[in-house]
Amino acid sequence: MLDFLAANPLIALVVILAVGLAIGQIRVFGLSLGAAAVLFVALVVSTANTDIVIPMIVYQLGLAMFVYVIGLSAGPAFFSEFAKKGWKLTIFMLLLLATLIGLAWVLIKSLGLDAAIGTGMFTGALTSTPGMAAVVELIEGIDPSLASEPVIGYSLAYPGAVLGSIVVAAVGAKLLKVNHREDARKEGMITAPLVWKGVQLKPGITGRVGDLPRLAGESIIATRIVDDPHTHRLADPDLPITEGMELLINGTEEAVDRAIKALGEERETKIEDTELIYTRLTVSSPEVAGRTVAELDTVAHGFMIARIRQGDSEVVPKPDTVINYSDRIRVVVAPGRVAEVRRFLGDSEKSLADVNLLPLAIGLSLGLLLGAIPIPLPGGTTMSLGFGGGPIIAGLILGALKHTGPLTWQMPFHANRTISTLGLALFLAGVGTSAGAGFRAALTDSSSLIYMAGGLVITLASALLCAVIGMWVLRLRWDEAMGVAAGTTTNPAIISYLNGQTGTDLANRGYATVYPTAMIGKILGAQILFLLL
C-alpha cells in the first residue's frame, strides 16, 4: 500500500488529507487537533516510506492561500490595532527572537552539538521553513558538503514544535479557566445580544440625529423617529434634533440603557402596525461589499441598517463600519421598498456561491511576487519573504483597502474559511511528507534525542514567554497571547488549532500582527546564529 502511495502522489495527498482531517475531529478531554492532525499523519506515512513525497508546489500554494486569506480577514483591523499596540508587539517579537537565538546558542555550545544541525534545530523549533532554507543557502556558499545537515535538525525539532505549542495553549487555557468568548467580547470581537428601546429626548439635546451616539457616549444607532404610535419614519442621520423628539435606538442592552439616561427618558414603543418593518437581508452585491455604512447613503435608498451580523457576531453599525460579502443585515424599511433594497444589497445565495476568483488570483499573484523579491544582506547573501511572508503582507494591505475600483478584495465568509482550511491542509500534508526522510534517518541515531529535546526547550520557552509577557506586561488576553506564540512560529497548524478551540478571531489578530516581523526575523536570526557558532 505504501509503495502504491509513493508511486501516486495525488492519491497519497488525498488519503493523507482524509485520514488527517478525520483524526482531527476526534476529541480527547475536550480537545481536538483539527487540521493540524494532517501534519502528523503525513509525517508518520513519509517516515514509514520515505518515497512518499508531495510535490513542493502543492504546499507552497497551500501556505500562500492560507496566509493570504488570514491577511484579508485581519487587514481591516490590523493597521488600527498596530497604532494602538501592534508596535509594542513588534518590539516584543524582536526582543523575543533575540532571546531565543541566545538560548539556542547556549544549548548548542553547552551540549556540544553540531553547528549546522543545531541551527536547523533552531529553525525547526520555530517551524521556520524559510529560515532553514536560508541557512542551507548560506552553508552552500561556505561548505556545500554540510548543506543537508540543517534539514536534519529541522526535521527532528519540527514535530515537537507543533505539539509543544499546542500543549501550552491547551494546558494554559485549562489552568487559567479561560472563557474564550467572554475574552473576545471584552476585546470588541463579539458583541452582547442587541436590543432596541424607545427614548424621548430631554431639553438641551441639540445637533443632528447622527450625533446621538457621540452625545450619549455609547455605541448605539437611531433607526426610527416615532411621530405617533402608528407613524414611524427613518431616522435620517442628517435630520436636525427637535425638542421632545422620540426615537427608537439599537445597541447592546447596557449601551442602550446608559444612552437613555444620558439623552432623556425611556418610552414604551411598539413597532407593529407602523409604516416601517424589520427584515434581514444578505449582502451579495459587489457594489456594496467593501464599502462603509456612510458610503452607502442608506437613507437615500429607503432603509436604515439596525444591525449587522458578521460571522457569528452582531454589531451596531457605525459610519465607518465596513460591509462585507455574506454579512446579514437587519434593515428598517417601508414594506413597499423591500424589493428595491433587496436588489441594492443583492440578497442572493447563488451570487455568494459563484465566488469571483479574479481578486483572489490577483492578490495571490501580488503576494507571491512580493515574496520573490530578493533582499540583500551583509556578506553578499540575499533573503526573501517567500511564499508565506509575501502573501500575508499583500492580504493585510488589500484587506485594509477593501476595494480598488471595480475589484472587491474581501471574500464571502464561507469562501474565506473554505480556502483557508484547504490551503492549510495542503501545506501540512506537503511539509509533513518532506520531513519524513530526514526524520527517519535521524531516529536511528541516539544523539537525535538531544536535538529533539533542545528544540522542544526552545519551543516551550517561546510559547511560555509569549504567555507570561503577553498577558502580564502587554495586557493581552490568553487567546491573543497564544496567537502571538503561533505567529512566532509562523505555523498554520497552531493557529488552526487555536481557532478550532476558541471559536473566535482573537488568536488570529495576534497571529497576523506579528507574523511579518517573525517571518523576516527568523530568516535573519537563523543565519546570524550559524555565523555566531
UniProtKB/Swiss-Prot annotation:
UniProt keywords, alphabetically: Cell membrane, Membrane, Transmembrane, Transmembrane helix, Transport
MF (Gene Ontology): monoatomic cation transmembrane transporter activity
InterPro entries for the chain: AAE_transporter, RCK_C, RCK_C_sf, YidE_YbjL
Location(s) in or outside the cell: Cell membrane
Record membrane topology: Multi-pass membrane protein
GO terms (BP aspect): potassium ion transport
Keyword Cell membrane: yes
Secretion signal, residue range per the UniProt entry: none
Pfam families in UniProt: Asp-Al_Ex (PF06826), TrkA_C (PF02080)
Assigned GO CC terms: plasma membrane
Stretches that traverse the bilayer: 4-23, 28-47, 57-79, 86-108, 151-173, 352-374, 379-401, 422-444, 454-476
Protein name as it appears in the record: Uncharacterized transporter Cgl0590/cg0683
Taxonomic source organism: Corynebacterium glutamicum (strain ATCC 13032 / DSM 20300 / JCM 1318 / BCRC 11384 / CCUG 27702 / LMG 3730 / NBRC 12168 / NCIMB 10025 / NRRL B-2784 / 534)
